[in-house]
Amino acid sequence: MFDVIAFLVQEYRDFSACPGPDDLARKLAAVGFEDDVIHDALDWLSSLLAQGAVPEVLAESRLPRILTQEEREGLPLEVQDFVLFLDRVAAVNNVQREQILDRLMDVPPDERSLDAARLTVLAVLWRHAAEVDALIAEELMVAIDGPMPLQ
């Protein structure tokens, strides 16, 4: 599923340029993705799009985020640290952070890796057309391009 997300982020730099679900599914099938992977990815993205407005209190809160017991037990420690780091350095806002956590918790537990977290963050930022710091963008792109070689 995350291969489809990576493809979409690379193919459509602007989320609003994505075709509708039916056309997108046909294009993804033509590129070579399997139907079940396409279906899973489009459902996952649809859930991201369907997330409504959050309470204003959450959107404006400056309090640190404490993960729920379910999140602490369900997400690998490196994923927890990564998401909270992005929150702490204001690379994502509160709404984006909550969407990232929601989308990660919707993934099967065996797929909740650091690369999955990077791609989830990319998808959420892509959906919001958010500006991303160059160093953060480089870290996120590791999930697509692999680590940059040392020079």
Swiss-Prot record:
Top-level taxon of the source organism: Bacteria
InterPro entries from the UniProt entry: Smg
Any Pfam family: DUF494
Family: Belongs to the Smg family.
PANTHER family in UniProt: PROTEIN SMG
Protein name: Protein Smg homolog
Species this protein is from: Laribacter hongkongensis (strain HLHK9)
